[in-house]
């Protein structure tokens, strides 16, 4: 099979010269391909994934450990107190409740488990509860324990690390140049600072964003290169699910092929990093969900999301086992 010449040249460059071979302008050229070349992009992204990531699949799971009443005004989020939604407001779950859910998801086949909380940050007592839960989960399951708790201080990051948290998740959400259109209650640099604090404490970094917010293709590349500069350890890719009551409620879903092209683009820019397909997968990709691996993905969230329902974990495991893996 003869691939599109641009796709083939850039893919070979990545295979020959290493994970950071692609320049910003070369990445942008992949967003300007004719429609007939998009399948070639997927095949090349799959080849890059297999070269750097083999066929290992990461199955992430998350728990909404504290829900609603967030002071931030992120345009897409149903948990923001600036939006009128039907999200249930709930304080932090007990450590026991978090441990129980982790054990259930471990039995179901998840490989990572993340405790996720609404709000800008947790207080010291809440951090202690999460740390206690993480310690028990680490000892009683096979799961890699993750946390997504908003902004961090050095002391809170150190407590999480001591408790057994391995990965800290904190999305940039979008490009720096587009961020003011999405959130005005905190600065982009605060998110980057949290990632740096987490890394200094010895936590691995999981950071990505949401696509379909109105950002341009160049801004998608911009965020990818910011993540590359930060050298994050894994990258979650979300697609906007326009929820009633949010400022994004009337936005259209990304077309499935465009969503898959985003995945392939990020595989070219991040050849050796796990790309995890997360929120909006089912509603955006529909019958094309199994194509995520062809497009370069190496993992996904299984089970439910924060405020929306996912599909049965068994269905996703069957999809993987009967597909490319």
UniProtKB/Swiss-Prot annotation:
Function text: Catalyzes the conversion of dethiobiotin (DTB) to biotin by the insertion of a sulfur atom into dethiobiotin via a radical-based mechanism.
Pfam families assigned: BATS, Radical_SAM
GO BP terms: biotin biosynthetic process
PANTHER family named among the record's database cross-references: BIOTIN SYNTHASE (PTHR22976), BIOTIN SYNTHASE, MITOCHONDRIAL (PTHR22976:SF2)
Name recorded for this polypeptide: Biotin synthase
Co-factor(s): [4Fe-4S] cluster; [2Fe-2S] cluster
Protein's organism: Syntrophus aciditrophicus (strain SB)
Subunit structure: Homodimer.
